[in-house]
Structures are given as structure tokens and as C-alpha cells.
Amino acid sequence: MKKMERRKFLQVIGAAALMGAAVFLTGCDESSPVPGPEQDKGDGSVSLASLEAFSGHLNWNNGVEPEDVSGNSYSRAANYMVCVFSNGAEWDFLKSYTSDGYGYGFAEYRVSGKYKKLTMKLAPHKLMNKDGNAYIKVYADDKLVATSEFVKKKSSVIDFEANIAGAEYIKLEVYIHAGSCIGEGSDGNDGALIMADAKLWP
């Protein structure tokens, strides 16, 4: 290889390496992993996952594959959460039972009157039993403002919306039916929920 050709070759290799490093650091590659809560969708909304809860805890982007019963993935949503009442650190936000047999978790966020509504998508996770179900509630300044319909194994994706206009703080409650086993079965009734694209709108 001639001297000039070698120099050009090394310049090309160096540029390619820098481009690869930039993709790795910025996450701009189309095949990059799940986007974090800081992702800017350019629609004026704020990811709920970017707020720090002052009470309670919900485990956003908890590393569990957010695939629904139809095989659709929500891993490229602004945020996501998979909720199953089972063993494992990824489920530790569902610490309590309700009297009617639901695993329960919640988080409260200070929103300081900045937002008019909270929206998200609800879908049955692939671990949802055939008789399982799940639902959520939203409170604004301790007043119940929205309750979702039950999410069941054969449910379509639900576009959920809660009016939180003027609220200083909001509370999101998650209820997952806690049955006897995960998976198909005649008595299977465990719930398994995907919450995705939880956004606050000014």
C-alpha cells in the first residue's frame, strides 16, 4: 500500500470508529436498547418516569420484556412497566395484597399544577392468565379522577387518560390480580399488565 493510500485508509477507519462511538454514547442507533425516561418525543409531553416519586414506588423500565399476548413489543415506548405479582426484585413495587385478592403498588408525584392530563397505554402482558385481570387508578390531590377498565387476556390496547388539570400532586395506583399460578391453566387467574408511554401534558 502506498504511503498516501495508507493515510487515507487510516483516516476512513478512524472516522468510522468515531461514528460508532457516537452511536454508542448517544443511543441514536435504530437498534439501540429501550429508551430511558429522558427521551424527548418532540410532542411537548413529559415522561412520567422522569419524575421522582415522593411517596411509594413504581419500577419504570424494569428490564422485563414488555411483550403483550399478541406478540407486540412496547420496548421503544417513552417508558414502560411490566407488572406481575410474583417473586423477584423487578416486582418489588407490588408489596401488598388487597382484601379482594389484588397485588397493589402505588407512587405519588409532585406535578405543581403544570399539567392538564396524564395518558398511557395499557395492554395484557404475555404472562396474563386466561382468567387474570389488572387495572389502575389515578388520584389528583387525593381525589379519584380516573379508573381504567379491567385489562384481561383478550383485551385490546387501552388508551387511558386522566384529567389532572390544576393538581399539585398525583397518585398512580396499580392493581394486579394475584392468583395461584402464572401461565395457562384451568384455574389460572394471575394478572400481568403492561403500562407504556405514560406522559404528562401541559
Walk through the language-model features, giving the residues of each:
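Gly-Asp-aromatic-enriched flexible segments
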Residues: 36-202
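C-terminal motif of bacterial Sec signal peptides marking the signal peptidase cleavage site
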Residues: 26-27
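Hydrophobic h-region of N-terminal signal peptides that target proteins for export
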Residues: 19-23
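N-terminal secretory signal peptides and thylakoid transit peptides that target proteins
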Residues: 1-17
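Short, conserved catalytic or interaction motifs in soluble domains
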Residues: 30
